[in-house]
Amino acid sequence: MNARTFPHPPQPLTDGTAPILAGFECGRLHWNGHDLLHSTAHLPHAAMPHHYAVAREQGVAGARDGLSWRHDIGARVNAVPQGFPVIWDLVHFDAPPRPVQHAVACCQALGPDAWAIAVNEPSVGRRVSGMTPGRATDMALRMMATAACLPVRPRFATCDPFHHLHPSVFKATDRLVASGHVDMVGVNYYPHHAAEPLHRILRAVADRYRLPVMIAETGWHDGLRAAHRRFPHVRDRWDWLAHVQAEIALSGVPVAGLCWYPWLDMPAWDDPAHGRWPCGWPGRQA
């Protein structure tokens, strides 16, 4: 099984920046049934092996991916190159009808020393995920508690948006960390939503939780006016990557990884048949 992922504790780079991870979109949108694994062909029998081969060629340190209850869990795990580090989302905008059973199935497929995220972005709410923040957080807690009872369980990270420092932004992560099942805190930070500099976000998160920190999602959408308005010095995706790495170094926080999300230019959520959003990795994708 290709279960081995990041060392514990995760290791940042010695120059104050973070190693790059490839983030593969793996959700299913509740309002229109758009399965992003299908629309990007990120499937074991399709382009998934090629996607990983190209990501490795680009020098990434690992990836984020997903184990949807609608897909063959074992086939997805085994499609990853042997020994390549992956953090697996167990739920990504598509709640399984039986979350506990899904958690057990994922843990059995992953084996020892794996990393997982129980529920992606529990704070985003019903409009995006189909779940209220409370329900999504409760689901994550049940899944992690179930995993803790198994003889073999993954280490868990969190993954939630942190674009400002209002107390409300910490609510879901506070509950998850308080459970005692979390080994790393993930910060999602996008330029079109950012209201606080990233270095302040990272320092606040590191000081609050005293756990390893990673940037679980960040990226740049070419031509998105809100992003250009907030960061007029950023011209393109390479500039955004440099900006994020500079903010990591400025924070002084040893960030375990920087996940570029999504790695592939993304089919439009509401109209996947017509073009792709220019937001994937600025180097060769796949």
How would you label these PLM feature ranges?
Residues 24-30:
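Short polar catalytic/cofactor-binding loops
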Residues 30-42:
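Acidic/histidine-rich helix-loop elements
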Residues 75-83:
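Catalytic-core regions built around general acid/base machinery
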Residues 233-240:
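Short secondary-structure subsegments characteristic of cysteine-rich extracellular domains
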